[in-house]
């Protein structure tokens, strides 16, 4: 009796998630075009998917950050400091580019609901006051109410405290982190069904206008990533090595960025990057540390995604943003981006943290995350390509700068 089901199961497990999401997206569009009444009913599937994301996100951020800080190994710094600085400068610069682009070309999203109870902040002073109150929130309440800033504060604090714990305790935290990550991966496997429901109901209600909104959003996102890859990063590298950066930039994009675009995983691209560093003749003790580290904290693409989608939500809801608050968002996006590598679904699940700066409720923020999943086919690939290629680029720039200093001495 179960035999006929096996080919379908086999097909689902063998087909990549990207292909399944494309199928879900196309199926949702077709259903909305030809059977709008039925499309509205399957919107329930999308709601279930968003609710699952909403449920798992606070626990994920808390456990992941706490475990990563607790298990961080001290020592072995040699040439890592200048590379770390480049990683931080690159990520912050990407967030600033995204802020400028979002102000120049504001994007609007089609959201299912826009609650009237929102109280947007009046300026930087109010934002900082709310930020401080969020930081000192009760940890249990922070998890229940999805207060991501409070969750982050407690996770960092406990992570630092657990660094002095026994090996067995730190191993337990690692295993707990692995368990939560596995649950997230299971939720993400249902993304094609969730996207199908979301796309079908969204286009049945809003029609082609929603598609135009996503197209504009994609252009802004990909435009920012291309600008960072071909203008900002080369400028940073030029200031470091004092010669034409483009041969190195193009090599990194071709050798590392292309594979990362299709694997959509910075971690999976680490062996490719290590091999490229070896071919470039870089210092092995340096790149063996900086490349895995970069796959964790060097997240220019994630900073762009978090910033652009957050400001798209802000613009959609009619919230005014002053310049100091935008700068604060750049900092928050950079910090959030550093934690994006450990999250299945990348930077998207960290958007609620940035949205909370502007008083945007969790349910609206998770709708923005759902929009992110709809455009993730291109966004996630481009984001990973930028992140991973920049790991090699900045490592090579720092190594070449050190060699230049040594030869000049």
From Swiss-Prot:
It catalyses: L-serine(in) + Na(+)(in) = L-serine(out) + Na(+)(out); L-threonine(in) + Na(+)(in) = L-threonine(out) + Na(+)(out). Pfam families: SDF. The keyword Transport applies. It is a multi-pass membrane protein. GO terms for biological process: serine transport; threonine transport. Keywords: Amino-acid transport, Cell inner membrane, Cell membrane, Membrane, Symport, Transmembrane, Transmembrane helix, Transport. GO terms for molecular function: neutral L-amino acid:sodium symporter activity. The chain crosses the membrane at residues 17-37, 49-69, 83-103, 142-162, 180-200, 218-238, 299-319, 331-351, 357-377. SUPFAM superfamilies: Proton glutamate symport protein. It is found in: Cell inner membrane. The keyword Nucleotide-binding does not apply. One of its GO terms (cellular component) is plasma membrane. NCBIfam families: PRK13628.1. Belongs to the dicarboxylate/amino acid:cation symporter (DAACS) (TC 2.A.23) family. Involved in the import of serine and threonine into the cell, with the concomitant import of sodium (symport system). This is Serine/threonine transporter SstT. The gene is sstT.
């Amino acid at each position: 009796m179960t035999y006929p089901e096996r080919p379908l199961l086999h097909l689902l497990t063998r087909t990549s998630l990207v292909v399944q999401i494309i199928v879900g997206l196309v199926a949702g569009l077709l259903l909305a075009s030809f059977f709008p009444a039925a499309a509205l009913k399957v919107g329930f599937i999308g709601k279930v998917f968003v609710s699952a994301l909403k449920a798992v996100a606070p626990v994920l951020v808390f456990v992941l950050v706490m475990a990563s800080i607790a298990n961080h190994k001290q020592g072995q710094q040699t040439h890592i400091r200048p590379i770390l600085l480049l990683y931080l400068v690159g990520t912050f610069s990407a967030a600033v580019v995204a802020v400028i682009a979002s102000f120049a070309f504001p994007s609007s999203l089609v959201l299912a609901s826009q609650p009237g109870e929102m109280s947007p902040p009046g300026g930087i002073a109010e934002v900082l006051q709310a930020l401080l109150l969020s930081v000192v929130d009760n940890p249990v309440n922070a998890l229940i109410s999805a207060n991501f800033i409070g969750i982050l504060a407690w996770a960092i604090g406990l992570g630092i405290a657990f660094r002095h714990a026994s090996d067995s305790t730190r191993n337990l935290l690692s295993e707990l982190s692995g368990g939560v990550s596995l649950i997230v991966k299971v939720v993400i496997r249902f993304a094609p069904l969730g996207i199908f429901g979301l796309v079908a109901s969204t286009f049945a209600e809003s029609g082609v206008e929603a598609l135009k909104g996503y197209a504009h959003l994609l252009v802004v996102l990909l435009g920012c990533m291309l600008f960072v890859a071909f203008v900002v990063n080369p400028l940073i590298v030029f200031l470091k090595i004092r010669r034409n950066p483009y041969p190195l930039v193009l090599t990194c994009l071709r050798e590392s960025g292309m594979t990362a675009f299709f694997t959509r995983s910075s971690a999976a691209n680490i062996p490719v990057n290590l091999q490229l560093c070896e071919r470039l003749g870089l210092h092995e003790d340096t790149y063996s540390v900086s490349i895995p580290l970069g796959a964790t904290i060097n997240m220019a693409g994630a900073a762009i995604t978090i910033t652009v989608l957050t400001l798209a939500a802000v613009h959609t809801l009619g919230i005014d943003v002053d310049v100091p608050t935008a700068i604060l968002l750049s900092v928050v996006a950079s910090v959030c981006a550093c934690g994006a590598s450990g999250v299945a679904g990348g930077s998207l699940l960290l958007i609620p943290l940035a949205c909370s700066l502007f008083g945007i409720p969790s349910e609206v923020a998770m709708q923005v995350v759902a929009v992110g999943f709809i455009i993730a086919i291109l966004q996630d690939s481009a984001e990973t390509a930028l992140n991973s290629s920049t790991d090699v680029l900045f490592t090579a720039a720092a190594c070449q700068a050190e060699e230049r200093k040594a030869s000049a001495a």
